[in-house]
Protein backbone atom coordinates (compact mmCIF):
# COMPACT_ATOMS: atom_id res chain seq x y z
CA UNK A 1 0.00 0.00 0.00
CA UNK A 2 1.50 3.29 -1.07
CA UNK A 3 -0.19 5.45 1.56
CA UNK A 4 -0.06 2.88 4.36
CA UNK A 5 1.59 5.29 6.80
CA UNK A 6 -1.60 7.35 7.07
CA UNK A 7 -2.97 4.65 9.37
CA UNK A 8 -0.18 5.44 11.84
CA UNK A 9 -1.81 8.85 12.31
CA UNK A 10 -5.51 8.07 11.78
CA UNK A 11 -7.18 4.87 12.95
CA UNK A 12 -8.90 2.91 10.16
CA UNK A 13 -12.11 2.84 12.21
CA UNK A 14 -12.19 6.63 11.93
CA UNK A 15 -10.50 7.22 8.57
CA UNK A 16 -12.47 4.81 6.38
CA UNK A 17 -15.95 6.02 7.40
CA UNK A 18 -14.74 9.61 7.19
CA UNK A 19 -13.42 9.07 3.66
CA UNK A 20 -16.60 7.29 2.54
CA UNK A 21 -18.78 10.01 4.08
CA UNK A 22 -16.79 12.69 2.27
CA UNK A 23 -17.21 10.84 -1.03
CA UNK A 24 -20.98 10.54 -0.54
CA UNK A 25 -21.35 14.20 0.42
CA UNK A 26 -19.29 15.34 -2.58
CA UNK A 27 -21.34 13.16 -4.91
CA UNK A 28 -24.66 14.48 -3.59
CA UNK A 29 -23.49 18.10 -3.82
CA UNK A 30 -22.30 17.65 -7.41
CA UNK A 31 -25.51 15.92 -8.47
CA UNK A 32 -27.62 18.61 -6.81
CA UNK A 33 -25.62 21.34 -8.54
CA UNK A 34 -26.03 19.70 -11.94
CA UNK A 35 -29.76 19.16 -11.40
CA UNK A 36 -30.35 22.77 -10.40
CA UNK A 37 -28.19 24.43 -13.07
CA UNK A 38 -29.15 22.46 -16.17
CA UNK A 39 -32.49 22.21 -17.93
CA UNK A 40 -31.96 18.99 -19.83
CA UNK A 41 -30.97 16.64 -16.98
CA UNK A 42 -34.19 16.90 -14.93
CA UNK A 43 -36.18 16.40 -18.14
CA UNK A 44 -34.04 13.37 -18.95
CA UNK A 45 -34.67 11.89 -15.51
CA UNK A 46 -38.42 12.46 -15.92
CA UNK A 47 -38.36 10.56 -19.22
CA UNK A 48 -39.58 13.33 -21.51
CA UNK A 49 -38.98 13.09 -25.23
CA UNK A 50 -35.82 14.49 -26.70
CA UNK A 51 -36.03 17.78 -28.58
CA UNK A 52 -34.77 17.62 -32.16
CA UNK A 53 -31.80 19.83 -32.98
CA UNK A 54 -32.56 22.74 -35.25
Swiss-Prot record:
Superkingdom of this protein's organism: Bacteria
Residue ranges that the UniProt entry lists as topological domain Cytoplasmic: 1-14
GO terms for biological process, alphabetical: photosynthesis, light reaction
Keyword Protein biosynthesis: no
Subunit structure: The core complex is formed by different alpha and beta chains, binding bacteriochlorophyll molecules, and arranged most probably in tetrameric structures disposed around the reaction center. The non-pigmented gamma chains may constitute additional components.
TM segment ranges: 15-35
Name of the featured protein: Light-harvesting protein B-800/850 alpha chain
A Pfam family reported for this protein in Swiss-Prot or TrEMBL: LHC
Extent of the signal sequence: none
Primary role: Antenna complexes are light-harvesting systems, which transfer the excitation energy to the reaction centers.
Keywords on record: Antenna complex, Bacteriochlorophyll, Cell inner membrane, Cell membrane, Chlorophyll, Chromophore, Light-harvesting polypeptide, Magnesium, Membrane, Metal-binding, Transmembrane, Transmembrane helix
Location of this chain's protein in the cell: Cell inner membrane
Cellular component terms per the entry's GO annotation: organelle inner membrane; plasma membrane; plasma membrane light-harvesting complex
GO molecular function: bacteriochlorophyll binding; electron transporter, transferring electrons within the cyclic electron transport pathway of photosynthesis activity; metal ion binding
SUPFAM superfamilies linked: Light-harvesting complex subunits
Membrane topology, record value: Single-pass type II membrane protein
Segments on the Periplasmic side according to the record's topology features: 36-54
InterPro entries: Antenna_a/b, Antenna_alpha, Antenna_alpha_CS, Light-harvesting_complex
Residues reported in the UniProt entry to bind a bacteriochlorophyll: 31
Protein family according to the UniProt entry: Belongs to the antenna complex alpha subunit family.
Amino acid sequence: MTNGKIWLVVKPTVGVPLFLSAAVIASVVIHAAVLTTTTWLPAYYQGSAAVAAE
